[in-house]
Amino acid sequence: MPAFLARPSATPPERLAAGPLVLRRVAADDAAVIAAAVGASLEHLRPWMAWATPEAADIRTQLLRVAEADELWETGTGFIYVMIARDSAPARPPGTAGSRGDPDGEFVGTIGMHRRAADDAVEIGYWIASAKTRRGYATAAARALTPVALELSGAGRVEIHCDEANTASAAIPRRLGYRLDRIEAHEREAPGERGRRMIWVWDRGESPAAGWSAGPAGRAARSGAG
């Protein structure tokens, strides 16, 4: 087992440091800020995310999705985190913290790990609010979750999927050193897609790329450019 992997685990930590971000398990308290970010980002998200509809900007929809995320977490099939930008946090007096014990900071987006039935792959997926793009946040979060995903029991590889036309999303696994395993046809689900899905893979046994930190949480991980 590579040195940067720990012992296999059924579930990941509920809170992780990821360079400029804190990744925290999504909770009902996050529904309002997620709904607001989706609403402000619909034009940015709609070309690539089939779920990016006006209904997704409703807090009631997000409360339902948080409940679904809780069920996935408890069954060990999906693990959804909110990304909070620590580098945007104002200074606070020693010994104080924001709500839920997190440092103050701005919501950036969400990222998740998904187990696939009868498969040893763990898929990482993410979205970033339109006001927070091009700051390295998705790269930092995916960098932190890659070794965490490989620590899940039975995980043999990590995958990142994106349509071939979504060059911004594809730049993230490429930057991190993932291998483009294949491009396969798929049904177009969002208007910007070409119907050609890129499957980027990180196999168990590969060592982290230069600049990656040791340890499952990626505590010292360096922020990327995208």
Q: Residue ranges of each PLM-predicted region?
A:
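A short helix-loop-beta-strand connector motif used in the catalytic cores of GNAT acetyltransferases and
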Residues: 54-55, 67-82
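Conserved GNAT-fold acetyl-CoA-binding loop/helix
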Residues: 46-67
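Acyl-donor (CoA/ACP) binding surface of acyl/acetyltransferases
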Residues: 1-33, 37-47, 80-226
